[in-house]
Amino acid sequence: MATLVHDDVIDESAKRRGQETLNSAYGNRIAVYTGDYLFTLCFRLLQDHADSARELDLDTKGMEKILLGELNQMDRKYDSNMRMRDYLNQIQGKTAQLFALSCYSGAYNTPYARQAYQIGSNIGMAFQITDDILDFASDDSKTGKPVLQDVKNGIYTAPVLYAKMKRRSDLLPLLEKGEAITNDELNKVYEIVVASGGLTEAQALAGKYTRKALKQIEKLPESVSQRTLSLITEQMLNREH
């Protein structure tokens, strides 16, 4: 929650999943302090409930990776030289790590904790790639945020990076506009990404991580929880928001 609150401040987002963001409703100052408070609360809960120093160490290192992923994304804003490898490293930190820790915590003190960590990591990768695809959705009432918000904010994700591989000479001059990019130029970016198959390639990549997660979930003991996790993972790939 803390990272999402801070992320909305950084991106100047007015909506998240169709709901008004904290910074939009109450201003950046309150939003930042709220995020800080949530971080403090998180570590207090860890101190109170962590069963071992090893568990506490894993959680704190996980948070470190999440924040480093966010910092890396900020550092690479409007970087037209962004590569797919850079993007995957970013989302491995800022999103996949969060899902991995969540799944690991649910399976802690069981023989499946390490497996759950890997499942969460793959789910997180698929989730973020799908989220980045939705930035190109034509109906922002479904996604809850403006279309092409990531591109406008200088965050170049899988669809753009795949398109750049095929249409570099067309796309690069537009990305190099940086913060000065116009709405007409954003529309050109959209057209290039769609025409070059950038969205299709990104969907295939999300599908790859989804299949990896499902394969690992199949190895868990059969139960209601296992079937529910499998269903959620499948539905996530086809979500509209």
Language model: regions and residue ranges:
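All-alpha prenyltransferase/terpene-synthase fold signal
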Residues: 1-241
